[in-house]
Amino acid sequence: MAAAVAAAAAVRSRILQVSSKVNSTWYPASSFSSSSVPTVKLFIDGKFVESKSDKWIDIHNPATNEVVGRVPQSTKAEMEAAVAACKRAFPAWADTSILSRQQVLLRYQQLIKENLKEIARLITLEQGKTLADAEGDVFRGLQVVEHACSVTSLMLGETMPSITKDMDLYSYRLPLGVCAGIAPFNFPAMIPLWMFPMAMVCGNTFLMKPSERVPGATMLLAKLLQDSGAPDGTLNIIHGQHEAVNFICDHPDIKAISFVGSNQAGEYIFERGSRNGKRVQANMGAKNHGVVMPDANKENTLNQLVGAAFGAAGQRCMALSTAVLVGEAKKWLPELVERAKNLRVNAGDQPGADLGPLITPQAKERVCNLIDSGAKEGASILLDGRKIKVKGYENGNFVGPTIISNVKPSMTCYKEEIFGPVLVVLETETLDEAIKIVNDNPYGNGTAIFTTNGAIARKYAHMVDVGQVGVNVPIPVPLPMFSFTGSRSSFRGDTNFYGKQGIQFYTQLKTITSQWKEEDATLSSPAVVMPTMGR
């Protein structure tokens, strides 16, 4: 009992520390007592406002399952007000010079740097990942903001002078209007930062719906954007679940939707949003394979497999959840298990923690059930993390590193995205067999090959039907000057996130054919035939 009281007190202390730092905007420290918990605000037209909803969702610290806050399911009126604020702000923001919009983002990236550790602490409190991993979450999002500051180069149009005498042809990119983003729980800072900074620097206004499980980081990011000089109404934030998603998919004033999350939700949003005439980009699930050749650097490969499989407790869409050991590389399996055993499982804010808890008890149960299915279907559990107990955090959603071998492509633990600290291991005799396994899997988010042979690496990179390939790089998430190019069942849409494709998604082309005659003359008679542009 005493331990439980102490743990609860520690959680309250962390809430109050974070609250005071962010001026009690959405976690008002003064309202926290033994009978109440902080409430997350809405952000509408430049103001953080308390929701009038009668439906609220508890936010839990995954390490303790202690309630640390409550987030509203926004009412229809509140969601309408948020879109209306976006719509009102759009004309002036779109007409704001591109240099002025760039200056807002330049100030914004500096404020994110200055507040990076505070954002990371909020992430760890609500999501559970280690503080170091949470800082990486913020940093990878910050890189996209920094890239968005290059908008003056990214939004260049095209020209073709003198297509005929006195006639020029040119195009430029224009914002769409009101855009919306629906973010997942696993990257509370990075994914929102993939969305609204890119959209807004192009001249759009933005409606953001963070995950109801981890809203705090997005709210702090909104405050920092406001402090950077973004006009009221250019970014608005609502909260909720299914009703909020349907609202975004159906609202006629929303022109484009960015989504990251599960396949079930992504397919639904893509179909419903597209049916309503919206652009939709949806990053979804994955089953990322790491193919290990026997000539690979053994030390580096084993360390990279362990880090990429179990970091963030496997709750990454780019987690390396499947290892394919080719030929003699299968002899490395015992050493792989020993390295995974050495990882330290603890609450994310504890020193030395390598991985924290899963997001919810339901997520833990699902992961454990998938491990069970492997054993029942004939696989071997070489390392079992199902019964791990973390001292002082016995109520947390912890699963330790788990390695399942003798896995076949027909097994449930292989076919489903586990989204937990579980590595499934398959074995093949040849590279061609490994390539077939990867290509037969429906997902196409990421893959990696570990080898010291350049010809093998090139063959693999060219033959696998996967959008992002790493060569001795286990998690090949592109830097933002490129784009996140997941494919097949991992993505729906025509245009990917950030980079050049991100600019294309959030803009539309306008093409202008202009004629200014050299002589000051007028037509002597109407031209009634089809223009041939001088040909």
UniProtKB/Swiss-Prot annotation:
Family membership: Belongs to the aldehyde dehydrogenase family.
Residues annotated with N6-succinyllysine modification: K47, K52, K55, K76, K117, K129, K364, K376, K391, K517
Stretch forming the transit peptide: 1-32
Active site, per annotation: C317
Gene designation per UniProt: Aldh6a1
Listed PANTHER family: MALONATE-SEMIALDEHYDE DEHYDROGENASE, METHYLMALONATE-SEMIALDEHYDE DEHYDROGENASE [ACYLATING], MITOCHONDRIAL
Stretches of the chain forming a coiled coil according to its record: none
Location of N6-acetyllysine modifications: K47, K52, K55, K76, K87, K117, K129, K298, K330, K331, K364, K376, K500
A Pfam family assignment: Aldedh
Tissues expressing this chain: Expressed in the head and flagellum of epididymal sperm but not in testicular sperm (at protein level). Kidney > liver > heart > muscle > brain.
Gene Ontology BP, a term: valine catabolic process
Protein function: Malonate and methylmalonate semialdehyde dehydrogenase involved in the catabolism of valine, thymine, and compounds catabolized by way of beta-alanine, including uracil and cytidine.
GO molecular-function term, one example from the UniProt record: methylmalonate-semialdehyde dehydrogenase (acylating, NAD) activity
UniProt GO cellular component terms: mitochondrion
Binding site for NAD(+): A183, F185, K209, E212, R213, S262, E417
Phosphoserine: residues bearing it: S262, S380
Protein's UniProt name: Methylmalonate-semialdehyde/malonate-semialdehyde dehydrogenase [acylating], mitochondrial
Top class in the EC scheme: oxidoreductase
Catalyses which reaction(s): 3-oxopropanoate + NAD(+) + CoA + H2O = hydrogencarbonate + acetyl-CoA + NADH + H(+); 2-methyl-3-oxopropanoate + NAD(+) + CoA + H2O = propanoyl-CoA + hydrogencarbonate + NADH + H(+); (R)-2-methyl-3-oxopropanoate + NAD(+) + CoA + H2O = propanoyl-CoA + hydrogencarbonate + NADH + H(+); (S)-2-methyl-3-oxopropanoate + NAD(+) + CoA + H2O = propanoyl-CoA + hydrogencarbonate + NADH + H(+)
Quaternary state and interactors: Homotetramer.
